A protein has these predicted regions:
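Hydrophobic alpha-helical positions that pack around
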Residues: 1-56, 68
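Short acidic, glycine/serine/threonine-rich loops at helix termini
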Residues: 17, 52, 65-66, 89-96, ...
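Single conserved hydrophobic/aromatic residue that forms the stacking wall/gate
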Residues: 178-188
Length: 188
């Protein structure tokens, strides 16, 4: 029952600029609903991976072209993760989505940690999904059944598909597991 202030490095890194220029000026950066700047980590099949502080509001395509210097070997984007491993993925034809909280949410994902992972046209998306699910299965704290059991099942199904033993029913089973776990998990 005591006052608490919780900030992350990203918030604290904005303080010197705000002190020097004012909060009013900072709020002019970005776009309505997503003002200021944000640090995004860009990785995957880009020519220039790294961490970049940008004004909110540009499209993911602009971000990848400007800061990532495009895709390696001039390939096309097959998919990208807009906000870290737990964020729903976007396809390569969704590069025009603006990097704002509302635009990304309205498109069905989240900015989350700001970790943008780009996958080119040669990426096996089943293997990519399995890699992420394996991480979550391994890192699960085990407190809630949907996460503890669900990620293990997702991992097994994706492994079956990746090894060529997948069944058509695996798709509906994957979707069912995802929809069941979403409202019942503890971690939000």
């Amino acid at each position: 029952n005591k006052p608490t202030l919780v900030n992350n490095v990203e918030t604290i890194s904005s303080v010197p600029w705000i002190i020097q220029n004012s909060g009013k000026e900072y709020s002019k950066l970005g776009v309505e609903g997503s003002t200021g700047t944000r640090i995004f980590s860009l990785s995957g099949h880009v020519n220039n991976p790294g961490n970049f502080e940008i004004e909110m509001g540009q499209s993911f395509g602009e971000f990848i072209d400007t800061f990532g210097k495009g895709i390696k070997n001039n390939k096309n984007v097959k998919a990208y993760i807009p906000g870290g491993a737990s964020a729903p993925w976007f396809t390569g034809d969704q590069l025009d989505i603006k990097m704002t909280i509302d635009d990304v949410a309205n498109a069905g994902s989240m900015l989350g940690s700001g970790a943008v992972v780009v996958m080119d046209e040669d990426t096996n998306l089943v293997y990519a999904a399995k890699s992420i699910v394996s991480f979550f299965a391994h890192e699960s704290c085990g407190q809630c059944t949907p996460c503890r059991e669900g990620t293990t099942w997702l991992e097994m199904i994706l492994e079956r598909i990746a090894s060529g033993r997948g069944r058509l029913s695996d798709i509906s089973l994957l979707l069912s597991l995802i929809h069941i776990s979403e409202p019942t998990r503890l971690l939000r």
